[in-house]
């Protein structure tokens, strides 16, 4: 027997074909959401408050300080928030201290700071009753970047940019004359030496001393001449910079100093953030700059005089490690003191080394490092600027390397916690201005924190983010896999990110650093391709937001692959050589072969086993969760695998789903972490279990109660239904499944079914990927799903009086009211068709001046005779089904309703949709198609069913027939392998796991096929169900996992006769949602013209479009059975005339005798009375009344 048994949870065992021993379990798949939000609550929020506060008034006599904050209990539970359309949020109370610096008086007070949405355990937020997800954003990391560019003459130039998290950009660039310039915040360029002089190093010799001799430095110094002898060089430089930043304003050295301090050196205005400081220090650190260079001077320990490294030594990694302590200490540190006119006058510490130029061995190049400022310094320092300039100048000497902006070491993730912190900071910054003004205006003695704090800007910023940000998205709730994928999504779009139109090919492309961090397969097709990605299965964020991936460490001394796990970011990985997970190992953990396949800085090649530093932990660490659910992924073309991964997320939850016979072993973990199942929180024993709740007694005697969700409407209109798995007496452990969610079976993801599939053509019905299906799948509800739609009706106060929910609806017969209760609301369980009343509602009509008789009737019969209009909620087209639930909200019951709304009724209708022609089906390999024919299953007698589908030698009919031509050109051979292995698994009565890149080999496949007693080619003879004759050739028949997708024909079918028209053009609206018509465009008109179908064309352009009076007349004629009158003038013709007149063209309409005709006269029919809309409505009401009277008299009889 090939393979080995593996248990997945307590309910499923699979035969696995994996050969690689995995030393690391998958992390919790939604930790990117939950951990980030927890960090925000624990420390992120505190940091934001500490960034903005304390706030002082303009005279610095009062100061508002932050003490701490606390979250109280949420107002609603999760379920209540869903029902009441409320947000699941907790009130936050912040303690402030107001200090009067003149009197020393301190007032401490707790201030309510609004309701803050709280993340659920599933990683989602409930906002206004809807479940939402904050998508993590992939952005360019703050830091310093270097790039090269080639001009039109082929000359290579260099550029550099310091990008902060918040603040002005500082750029450097070279031109064709080898002069180096700087730009501050995208303004006009100035020689870079001007900025150096402004920093207090004004002498030419001083500049050469810092940066060393180079053509770029000399050329720039010559360009940067002393223009005004009355100013010092530093003052002149400061004025020149001020002129660039504030052109037209009077320039002084002092104003320039304060401007530059605000731009770069003030931590409140300029923030690199922790990640920016880490990146700047890493890039400008002397150790990375010296690596592999030949040192041009003896390195001497200043204290002992010992020569650490002799001149001419190559600075390999081992040499640098041997003197690391000295490099981190004071080795070659120089202190430069700026002159008194400088922007910042503190001494500047730099680390300087001389190395041999890689281009010209006779030249010496100076390398300047920033001497590692403290991590807490968030603003730029003069040392950072000088070290950046040195790196930039060294690039022309062949030292250092330019950055790849698409490298994942330069792109980071802003997860939900950071996005919320940024939003909160925006709100607090708006509040700060407000607070400062109030502190200055009001009397200091009576001021309290409560009085000066207005929380509205903060709550508005948070509300706006959750409600309308591009990154706050309505959760994709088609099935648990789509929920999970949505939580792990990484978007490069959104505020501070890219835009679709400006994103080029490079940004979207797969990069070698994506390996183990971002999935190379799962991304949308269309305009967002490559901009929206998914986290790989083992991907994890470090504290700076860079994605790490785990590797097994290789002990270089013994050559053994250890079980020690090291998490590496993309730029850390660049320093090492990593072997693949499938490298063969001996028993003792050493490599079995001397040459192994590995990667180093994007090169995939063979390496000697002795140079390997790390080994992948798992073959599936490359791909995302949805991709890891595709068996035989290694046999599929990547384009089709992309479709397969995306289509699994569109699977509709079925009534009785089945887990796949051929899985990958990922189904259990995906279902477990998706948040759609009920998972045990503690160990214990089941003491009560039914369909709605499970009670578990813990070992310490306390009782846990788990509520099971039944048929709740999901975000995508499917039934969200959980099924209990445990029974009384079962012992459960923490993490066990208590109930399956939608699209799950026995604790595994189950998106579809396992039908018997044959690759063959049948009467041409499976042309172009169409799917032929047996009626058995319809009758036995194999692909039946339940869909829930929500309809609501509200009563408001109108100018003419309040609307009312009632059973007394004008002009409606008793038949239409049979399922309404005494209030006029449909009963639960009623079967409704389109047009049926769900909620009876009347709205008062404008009452005309009443005659004396009417007033008398009014006085006698009261409200009976008043004018009301029927505005009942009716079932829309395609909305028929069974009423599942009714919810009523009124002010009297204490429900929160919108202003002006008195009562709100919600009706939920459930539809059971069987599969039908036009529905879309798919496998897991991107093999999708539309059901084109459902082959009937007749019955000759009670005993012998007749099946037109082809059948196997044992009489089993085939369930689905697919077109064999869909396989070769698409290159997704995985489907054929799945087909054969699925048949073998069914025959053996087992389930199989074939993990991606480590699954069943072709030998395993054929061994299993033989074990199952199938023919050696895994094909079979098929018999024609209509004639009983065998087909000429043997056919590939097997079991394939097929899913029904959310693109159902019921949602797309649409027809219109009478409907709404656009207000301006008077043409019918478009689209199913607006109950619109079909657009008959220019080309369609040409087609009718070509056939000479003038009458058809005329009615399309008039009655059916925008001939307003014509269509009313036509309607009347049809209802009265009269001949249809001639059409009038379309509204669009009048628009054309008016537009031409507005251009000053004299356009008139003339009759045969050249007499001018008024356009409105054209509509006046010869003798026809025009029926206006009001008349039409009256006629309809009269007709309805007559119908009702007739039905009432019939009832009496």
From Swiss-Prot:
An example Gene Ontology CC term for this record: DNA-directed RNA polymerase complex
GO molecular function: DNA binding; DNA-directed RNA polymerase activity; ribonucleoside binding
Domain of life per record: Bacteria
One Pfam family of this chain: RNA_pol_Rpb2_3
Cross-referenced PROSITE patterns: RNA_POL_BETA
Annotated family: Belongs to the RNA polymerase beta chain family.
Name of the featured protein: DNA-directed RNA polymerase subunit beta
Organism for this UniProt entry: Streptococcus pyogenes serotype M12 (strain MGAS9429)
